[in-house]
């Protein structure tokens, strides 16, 4: 296990010689669209410059599906004996071993281990006791229209803007949207409490539209404003990570101007995301690592 002082600086990339080797590269991970282990590794190589700022040196939680979508899957938050430890960092923070990567080879090593989804903490290895990105996950219940999800996302954005906080947005790769708030850092309790206050305010003002509890029985026709991603150890799917769902949808950063009723939440996939990235005139999240802002009261 690496100690804090043993870890190389971000983007060091000096730890390995040559790319990791894939065993059974033709193993199919998404049967419905014929995406193989090699295909997933190739995807990460192609989008590395886009995904790197959102995964490098951030503690990870991994959804492993060694036999592909539709087979048994499990979540892993700690390094495993089968992991390539030369490319997958393990980090001992007060006795807790975390998983992180620093290069595209690290991502490919995760592919080799059957990882189909990469989820991230809202922090980095440099300050694991401080949150530096909040996530509001808008998760629609049955019978909620996409237009209502879009409206909810814009309400989160506007409430944050009223507090002088800039936010960014991405598709979840499922049915919802994720609003992300970069900030200068606050302890986990402060971060979670702030995000909970936003969620509770929305449910108080529009109880017919929103709820802030996970209760499945109450979800019908409402959007769950999930603020629980903002506690220590909680995660949200990483920007540009695929989802272990039919079609291989990708959680895709978008500009706020793209967030309309016409936007399909699962529009971009492992197979077509590169086409979008080539057409973009600018990265919609270009400023996410440059924004300087503090949570209220911090």
Give, region by region, the residue ranges found by the protein language model.
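Short, conserved phosphate-binding/catalytic loop or strand-edge motifs used
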Residues: 171-181
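Catalytic palm subdomain of template-directed nucleic-acid polymerases
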Residues: 180-192
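Flexible loop/turn segments at secondary-structure boundaries
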Residues: 69-72, 82, 176-178, 232-234
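C-terminal accessory nucleic-acid interaction domains of nucleic acid-metabolism proteins
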Residues: 1-6, 10, 15-42, 49-52, ...
């Amino acid at each position: 296990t690496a100690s804090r002082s043993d870890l190389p600086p971000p983007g060091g990339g000096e730890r390995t010689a040559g790319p990791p080797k894939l065993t059974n590269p033709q193993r199919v991970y998404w049967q419905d669209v014929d995406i193989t282990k090699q295909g997933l590794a190739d995807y990460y190589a192609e989008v590395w410059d886009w995904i790197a700022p959102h995964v490098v040196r951030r503690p990870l939680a991994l959804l492993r599906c060694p036999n592909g979508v539709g087979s048994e899957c499990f979540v892993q938050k700690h390094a495993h004996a089968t992991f390539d430890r030369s490319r997958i960092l393990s980090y001992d923070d007060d006795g807790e071993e975390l998983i992180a990567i620093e290069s595209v080879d690290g991502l490919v090593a995760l592919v080799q281990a059957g990882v189909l989804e990469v989820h991230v903490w809202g922090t980095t290895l440099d300050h694991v006791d401080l949150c530096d990105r909040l996530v509001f996950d808008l998760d629609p219940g049955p019978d909620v229209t996409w237009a209502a999800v879009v409206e909810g996302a814009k309400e989160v954005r506007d409430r944050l803007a009223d507090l002088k906080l800039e936010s960014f947005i991405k598709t979840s790769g499922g049915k919802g949207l994720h609003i992300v708030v970069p900030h200068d850092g606050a302890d986990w309790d402060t971060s979670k409490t702030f995000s909970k206050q936003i969620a509770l305010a929305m449910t108080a003002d529009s109880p017919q539209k929103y709820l802030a509890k996970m209760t499945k029985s109450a979800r019908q026709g409402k959007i769950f404003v999930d603020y629980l991603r903002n506690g220590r150890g909680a995660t949200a799917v990483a920007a540009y990570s695929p989802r272990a769902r039919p079609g291989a949808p990708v959680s895709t950063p978008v500009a706020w101007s793209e967030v309309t009723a016409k936007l399909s939440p699962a529009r971009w996939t492992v197979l077509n995301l590169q086409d979008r990235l080539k057409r973009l005139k600018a990265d919609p999240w270009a400023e996410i690592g440059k924004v300087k802002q503090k949570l209220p009261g911090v």
